[in-house]
């Protein structure tokens, strides 16, 4: 059997090429064009489907033809010879189905003429196929249906297995007039479903391109849920020993098998303590921490706050506390450098107490660990406390699901292309997985751990670096693995398009200028404020004054205060929290200015406290929904009415008081009673459109959607003015 093109085979079996293509697709054979060549084995498979059914249909048609031959011959004694000849010719005409010259009338006349109606045998023969055509297909009424919002009467009837006219009738009986194409609300759908004893459930349409939906809890067997390692971030002031502590933990906890391995800097690493792994994010302080939070990624389970025992709480320490509190993660305080002679741990505890971190010895709930990162003292105590907090937090994951997680770092490598460091938060990541990362996608080509070793799988809380992406993602972007490569590609491309559109229509950050519009659109009633001042007294006084502003429905939220110039870290925090920065007798540095411009953060610089209060208070009052009052601006008396086709009734009027404006609303008063209230549609003097007509002048007025104007009516013009809040 030789090869053939699809259209050739279709011609052989008297079918359309599309039917053959559909059949090939059902057999999982790729087919897209009628010109495609099909192999001998594929032809054989098609023959089984089409030639077998063709044979059956031919046999049936022959049997029917023979039956039709016999029946006329049995009842021919009274017929003349010419009739017999015509009957004998008839089967030949039946076989010529595609003859364009064949007329339906000529085919029916010999068999369906007058004589056939008078013969009982002939009548019975004709009625045999009728019952087959009239057998009604009865659909069973389902016990439960799901429906999308905006379902029509016809679609509901189809789901219920009922006739649409029956649904229309039932709706009419409950007082709802609807046609087959009309959308139904939830109440109407439930009424109809109750009538048939069917449970109705609204189907929630999920946006497949929203990666956050894949992070929501999914159904999983309890057996599949397992404990996962904690993800820890170390934060603190610049010289308090964060890097030394990280190195100390890593060097003392590297297993024998890992010793001598080349460390791969992927932004995170994992160590083992008491046979339990702990993942540390090796990020550059709280800046990256906040950047991730600004993009909506919550990756950290525990924050280690490093404070030097000889230095105490410093500005960056306070910033780190505020970042951790804003992210709502538990804090463990590591009091470092206790080996120094000038160390004073009690002073550190007292200073941290001023920021809401009280040690357990003082009746608080914050864990304090004293250690020396250089000597390695207290490291074990810190790791034990991390494991204790982990047990309390009950961190769980399902390693059997497809992987989801967050990007820690990303770069464009000259030799490998886009490379991304990922933290697997749930599921298991494998080589070859189809993955969507932020606004890009690809397949996992290679995967290495923090020691630079190539691995094939990565479970929950394990940091890895992958290659194989189309583009470089951003730190904090989410990633999701899909089983279907086509689906991953489709979602990835859709997210790229959405990102392009979002960049074009990027919304502004909140500022005092656009605050009212932001609040109206987002119904946000909180104003996040960061205060930087020249002296602590001024900062505290300003914060206290702002907190005293009493405007109903609006709250001032001080998220950070400090002494010193406005820096880049302040701008990052303001951007993440969608807040504003107030500088009192201080200026922003060069990096802060550049960052504020790039992030769209509003900075307000002042030297007088009451002006700050006045400006903030004004903005907050604008945040509330405005109140309006009516102001009457004029009256006019209708002297004459003229009806003009396509325009309506024009009222020839005389302004008796004030003025009538084109954009004003009017109240039509007749015999002291208000008969209509609406908008001025047109205002003219002679043939010219005018914006307003003053007292003592005549004009022509038409009212929007109202023509029942009579002579003697009074037009009262008014506008709605916004009331300024006290």
Curated annotation (Swiss-Prot):
Residues 50-90 have a biased composition (Basic and acidic residues). Residues 372-374 are annotated as: G5. Residues 336-339 are annotated as: G4. Residues 261-265 are annotated as: G2. GO terms for cellular component: cytosol. GO terms for molecular function: GTP binding; GTPase activity; translation initiation factor activity. Residues 236-243 are annotated as: G1. Signal peptide: none annotated. Pfam families: EF-G_D2, GTP_EFTU, IF-2, IF2_N. Residues 282-285 are annotated as: G3. This is Translation initiation factor IF-2. Residues 227-396 form the tr-type G domain. Belongs to the TRAFAC class translation factor GTPase superfamily. Classic translation factor GTPase family. IF-2 subfamily. Residues 50-141 are annotated as: Disordered. It is found in: Cytoplasm. Residues 117-126 have a biased composition (Basic residues). Keywords: Cytoplasm, GTP-binding, Initiation factor, Nucleotide-binding, Protein biosynthesis. GTP binds at residues 236-243, 282-286, 336-339. It comes from the Bacteria. SUPFAM superfamilies: Initiation factor IF2/eIF5b, domain 3, P-loop containing nucleoside triphosphate hydrolases, Translation proteins. Gene3D superfamilies: 1.10.10.2480, P-loop containing nucleotide triphosphate hydrolases (3.40.50.300), Translation factors (2.40.30.10), Translation initiation factor IF- 2, domain 3 (3.40.50.10050). It comes from Macrococcus caseolyticus (strain JCSC5402) (Macrococcoides caseolyticum). One of the essential components for the initiation of protein synthesis. Protects formylmethionyl-tRNA from spontaneous hydrolysis and promotes its binding to the 30S ribosomal subunits. Also involved in the hydrolysis of GTP during the formation of the 70S ribosomal complex.
